């Protein structure tokens, strides 16, 4: 049985105040073309379908279009909510969507039930586990000792052990310890939100979302597929791809990838103002790519951002690197500001006030308080 593993679409995302919606539709159309040429038995969507809990209407319409296209191809879809999503909004209409073979994780209320599929090798069970926080699990099992994210995941998986006679696929959205991160991801200080890869040992394949770099964690079959598009300049040198996973007889899993080509690449360019405005330099380049330009001029160029955008209309970020400034003084910095979590803000404040960092226990306690406050705000 063959699946396409996708995650972190982040529909509606803005990078340095540039809307990515047109680029997102372009890459989704490319993914549909891949599916037309590479048959699969289902699509796994491992969370962060949207970039915000309350997405813009255009993003909602784009996801609706994409799911409709998959349903018209009679492809089962297995989707979960991520930390950027509102679980309630993602789960809206889930019971109706099942009639079109679109299976969406409900708001977490207990151990996920397997969704059985069959092929010539027998039964394959798909488990949908939305993004988990310890408070969610304590609410369901108040007598369980759940303090950390690892405790929370371990508790849930104890209550839904996969049938050892069946092949099993888990779709989840957590930060697994040991994985590599990018600037555009939300990862808590001290790794308080991390879980251990060994918790997934009972599953044949674990389709993960949350991290934007494609990578395995521990074993080949515990995998982040990464984002289909680059969402930060820390990803500029990455090559995005679609991840296909095929499960044969029990224990046999193979993984292949197909490259994805964006409408506009996201690149870093370096040079002096004169070099970058020399037609011979840029004539054969994709000047409409999303760019981070670093100028090496010793003196600031007046109105450099506007003047460079005449040639490079999608210039997102402009820095200088010279003798006077070696600390990467950003002229536009919304990308980094959006990526700082509340815990990171408090941790920096605490260290400034106390001249020492938060301990792991303090960070875990603060993270718990932050989540409780946010939960109260969502319920208000």
Placement of each model-derived feature along the sequence:
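Hydrophobic/aromatic beta-strand patches that form the interior of the parallel beta-sheet core
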Residues: 4, 44, 78, 105, ...
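Accessory, non-catalytic peripheral segments of nucleic-acid enzymes
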Residues: 37, 42, 247-380
């Amino acid at each position: 049985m063959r699946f396409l593993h996708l995650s972190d679409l982040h529909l509606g995302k803005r990078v340095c105040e540039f809307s990515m919606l047109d680029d997102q539709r372009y890459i989704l159309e490319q993914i549909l073309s891949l599916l037309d040429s590479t048959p699969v038995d289902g699509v796994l969507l491992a969370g962060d379908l949207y970039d915000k809990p309350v997405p813009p209407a255009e993003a909602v319409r784009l996801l609706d279009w994409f799911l409709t296209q998959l349903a018209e191809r009679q492809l089962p879809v297995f989707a979960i909510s991520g930390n950027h999503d509102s679980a309630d909004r993602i789960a809206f209409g889930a019971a109706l969507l099942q009639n079109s073979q679109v299976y969406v994780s409900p708001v977490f209320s207990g151990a996920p039930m397997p969704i059985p599929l069959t092929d010539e090798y027998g039964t394959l069970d798909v488990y949908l586990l939305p993004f988990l926080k310890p408070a969610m699990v304590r609410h369901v099992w108040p007598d369980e000792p759940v303090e950390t994210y690892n405790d929370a995941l371990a508790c849930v998986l104890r209550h839904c052990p996969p049938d050892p006679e069946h092949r099993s696929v888990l779709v989840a959205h957590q930060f697994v310890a040991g994985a590599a991160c990018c600037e555009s991801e939300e990862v808590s200080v001290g790794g308080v939100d991390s879980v251990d890869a060994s918790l997934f040992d009972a599953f044949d394949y674990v389709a993960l979302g949350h991290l934007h770099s494609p990578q395995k964690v521990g074993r080949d079959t515990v995998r982040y597929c990464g984002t289909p598009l680059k969402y930060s300049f820390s990803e500029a040198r990455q090559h995005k791809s679609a991840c296909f996973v095929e499960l044969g007889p029990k224990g046999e899993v193979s993984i292949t990838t197909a490259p994805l080509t964006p409408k506009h690449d996201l690149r870093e360019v370096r040079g002096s103002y004169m070099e970058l405005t020399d037609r011979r330099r840029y004539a054969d380049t994709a000047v409409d790519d999303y760019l981070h330009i670093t100028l090496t001029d010793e003196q600031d160029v007046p109105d450099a951002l506007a003047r460079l955008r005449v040639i490079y209309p999608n210039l997102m970020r402009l820095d200088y690197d010279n003798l006077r400034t070696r600390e990467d003084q950003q002229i536009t910095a919304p990308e980094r500001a959006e990526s700082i979590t509340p815990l990171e803000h408090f941790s920096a404040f605490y260290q400034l006030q106390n001249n020492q960092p938060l301990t792991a226990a303090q960070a875990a306690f603060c993270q718990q308080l932050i989540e409780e406050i946010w939960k109260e705000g969502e319920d208000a």
